[in-house]
Regions:
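Sec/Tat signal peptide C-region and signal peptidase I cleavage site
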Residues: 20-24
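Catalytic cores of phosphodiester-bond hydrolases, prominently lipid phosphodiesterases
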Residues: 25-371
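Bacterial N-terminal signal peptides
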Residues: 8-19
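Bacterial N-terminal signal peptides that target proteins for export
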Residues: 1-9
Length: 371
């Protein structure tokens, strides 16, 4: 979405001496945003479960049969990742499932084309929402999704930093339905890191070591405004492990302050790895979010969930998310998503934009647009 607001903000920052011409640090503007803004000073509308296709008729029938009470909440989907980037989305989410030996999630693909069967039988993390029920994805493996990101980035090297939430899920057995005990272990988390580094390359990444800098801990680096500017971070991706406490403990094992790791994580504020927070429900948590972003942390929240806001036309959650100052506001209903029901609800930032100066952390003035 095109808006004059980023250009106005760039001009304002130039007048304040906060932005200048392109230097060795990078361009003066990135996608119309002032290059000297730090990542934590920008608010973006993102997508939730970004890999998820809109359910096919076959998938709808399967969900209605196996889990009818969940159908309404799963009745959404997104265009391919490249199409989301073309729209202007710069924060996405990819759900990953452990498959170190290969074949764990291959059963639904027994009658698929041979190349697809081969892909699902190969070792490596797969991308899906829930085994046997909600598994249709624009890219079947984590490696394949990363390849899409890298290919798009190579074709658009001046893009804003893109934040990727990597939602690592365990799937314990469910009697009579799912017989496996699929859990992420250290080796699986190491493999995610290896895939990220191999596909994306160091020159396309923002990693914890960069943000920590010379500080003793990652949290200290964050509090000292260690996030890169848009000029320094353009063309790069920031990956965030979205998991559970067991995963977080494993992920920092041998990597204090996430030294040498490719991803950030959702660690508590008092921990040395604290950097990014996930506060899914912004309503009633606005003060907490403002506290965190004012301290230098990144916060992700959601504008809508499980199709509820779209069905009700309820923008209260969106409004709370946007005004809270959370840098990433995820939605299933931005312009360009499949909308077969014709819901009027649409998520965007004020002015209809998908990214803007953050109203709490940026030099934006009262409206969060420009000073």
């Amino acid at each position: 979405m095109v808006s004059a607001l980023p250009r106005l903000l760039a001009a304002a920052l130039l007048s304040l001496g906060l932005a200048g011409p392109a230097t060795a640090q990078g361009p003066a503007t990135v996608e119309g945003m002032p290059g000297q803004l730090r990542l934590d000073q920008v608010q973006m509308l993102g997508s939730h479960n970004s890999y998820k296709r809109y359910p096919s008729a076959e998938e709808e029938a399967r969900i209605r049969t196996l889990a009818p009470e969940h159908w309404d909440g799963l009745d959404y989907g997104h265009p391919p990742l490249e199409a989301q980037f073309a729209i202007g989305i710069r924060q996405i989410e990819i759900d990953v499932a452990p498959d170190p030996q290969g074949g764990l999630y291959a059963t639904p693909y027994q009658l698929a084309a041979s190349e697809m069967r081969k892909t699902m039988m190969a070792p490596g993390a797969k991308v899906l929402h829930f085994p046997q029920i909600d598994y249709e994805s624009h890219c079947l493996t984590f490696h394949a999704c990363l390849t899409v990101l890298r290919r798009w980035s190579d074709g658009h090297p001046e893009h804003l930093p893109v934040t990727v939430l990597v939602n690592a899920s365990d799937f314990p057995p469910i009697a009579g339905f799912w017989l496996h005990d699929a859990k992420f272990e250290v080796a699986d988390l190491d493999a995610l890191d290896a895939d990220i580094r191999a596909v994306m390359g160091a020159d396309h990444l923002i990693v914890p070591d960069m943000v920590r800098g010379a500080h003793a801990t990652l949290a200290e680096g964050v509090r000292a405004h260690g996030w890169p500017t848009l000029a320094a971070g353009h063309g790069r991706f920031l990956f965030v492990l979205d998991a559970n406490d067991r995963h977080y403990a494993l992920y920092r094992q041998g990597h204090p302050s996430l030294r040498g790791r490719a991803m950030f994580g959702y660690y508590a504020e008092q921990e040395s790895e604290a950097s990014v927070f996930n506060i899914q429900e912004p309503r009633g948590h606005e003060a907490e979010i403002r506290h965190l972003v004012s301290a230098g942390f990144l916060v992700r929240t959601r504008a809508d969930a499980d199709t509820r806001e779209a069905r009700a036309g309820d923008v209260s959650r969106l409004d709370a998310a946007v005004s809270s100052g959370a840098q990433f506001v995820s939605s299933d209903y931005y312009d360009g998503v499949p909308n077969p029901h014709g819901f009027a609800y649409r998520a965007s930032l004020p002015g209809g934009v998908l990214h803007r100066c953050d109203p709490v952390t940026g030099p934006c003035g009262q409206q969060g647009h420009h000073r």
